[in-house]
Amino acid sequence: GDAYYYSGCVYGNSSLNRIRETYGPGAAWIENGKSVKTEYLINADSGELSCAEFRAEDNGEDVRLIRSGLYAAGELSVARTTDEDGKVVYTFTDFEGKLLLTRRMNGTEPHDTYIVYDDRGRKRIVLPPLAADELTATASWGCNSSEVIKKYGYVYRYDGRDRVIEKKLPGCDPVHFVYDRSDRLILKQNGNNRKDGVWQYYQYDGLGREVIWGVLPSSTGREDWE
């Protein structure tokens, strides 16, 4: 049998106990030095270690995406991961630990996925590579009007209790959510449901377990259920 039937890891020399290298099980990996290597860096203001600075604002009717340039060098933590096949991925996090950017390298070509937060730290917008490649100007865009965001972006809206009340996926109409006073989802409606004039509903027993679900004919809007 294979003597290396286990996986393993190597820690760095710092007191932070961060993993520097991991090996999968199997002699073929270990004897050939096939491991996943991680370097811990900080961001720069140009090149592969640069990161655009986005934020999101909600005026009650629309979520706006605002790009204000690049983060200054040294503002972000960056992990550079190289897999067993030499493929490189950078992950950028702020000093609160929020993931801001995942950059997958195809040779020297980056493919960026940004996660954009509001001033309360809530995830508002996800920009996959096709969107990030288009939104490169220092500018702002309304998510309801930007064709790029409507086609490629993920957009989230919240109520005053930080519950997701609207979620928009690429190329789709928004999904609406309604909750009860115990923060349990009781109504959900996607674009097709709205066209059909129905809601998906959920009911719970005294222990909070979902026991009934079905379709409720109603053209009532989300705001009127609250």
Name what the model sees in each region:
Residues 1-226:
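Beta-strand elements of repeat-based all-beta scaffolds
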